[in-house]
Amino acid sequence: MVGCRLGGIGKCRVRHRCGTVDDEVPEVVVMTEVLLAVGTRKGLFIGRRRGGTWEFDDGPRFNAQAVHAVAIDTRGDTPRLLAGGDSSHWGPSVFHSDDLGRTWSEPAQPAVKFPMDTGASLERVWQLHPAAAEPDVVYAGTEPAALYRSEDRGESFTLVRPLWEHPTRSRWVPGGGGEGLHTVLTDARDPRAVTVAVSTAGVFRTTDGGESWAPSNSGVSAAFLPDPDPEFGQCVHKVARDADDPDRLYLQNHWGVYRSDDAGAHWTDIGEGLPATFGFAVAAHPHRGGTAYVFPINADSDRVPADHRCRVFRTPDAGKSWEPLSQGLPQDDHYGTVLRDALCTDDAEPAGVYFGNRNGEVFASADDGDTWEQLASHLPDVLCVRAAVVG
């Protein structure tokens, strides 16, 4: 089921966890250890790359739970993993691990819950985000769409009331996957600045630590609405922040790919050169400014890879041009859709790029996306992937 191959220099024999052996598998010497967390419809799978070889733990964590959100928090002396699981019997919860996913803890009281006066109940956790400028702060995005803040590294969370009580909330509507707050971006320069995205309400920003919020969607189209350019109501699928310029953001919309150069106040369409502008995922290169990745999907009514080819597209110049990245990826009759949190980068140099799809396949690149290897197949639907250097 799970492969452990990686392209590079030289040849080696690799024994898979299932017992089979591949001859003449390319070997690469990698000094850093990378942890990969793959959240699926039926559990969390964890892989590690050591010395150029990937190995995956036997079986999933949180068996039969949908894991929509994962975070790898490397800010402290010991990395902490956070996972948002959703049990059909016990309901949703947030778990944490301080030993790279070997063992997990769940708080005695629910980490994320809606206060009684809201009249709401937690459906799932869509996002877990360690804050860029506050070492112990973690944000959670949920369904129904709400933002929560933790000051103890994700063990307990408090509802950010001003966003929950925003005057536009009564006009927010669920997207196809539900009404979820799926993106949280913090600013290393200013802990008071937070950007979130909601499907279907659009982008909202605060510059005063969450006391007030404003829609931030100027230039982003909502072609499905009577007014195609509303203040809010856009079906934003994902937003990522540039590595060099914190005010530069990349946005994958229901239709359209956009860039902002002023922290989201205004957006410019950068979709020219892509085979399709529909898609779910966008990720930024961890070190190289102006570089971002998307995975184009044919259309909202035809949710398969553009031209039925498995290709990540990369821009090296903030959206002025796009290049397809397909070396090592299947190119014939491919139907694996990549969801909004199933594309990510690590913080290695060169950068690792990763994605998983609804076919249960996981692919990785160790060279900024130039070449790819398949790490896993036959998993449940991949909902999210996260990777980080941990050693």
Q: Locations of the language-model features?
A:
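Extracellular glycan-interacting surfaces
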Residues: 4-7, 12, 16-391
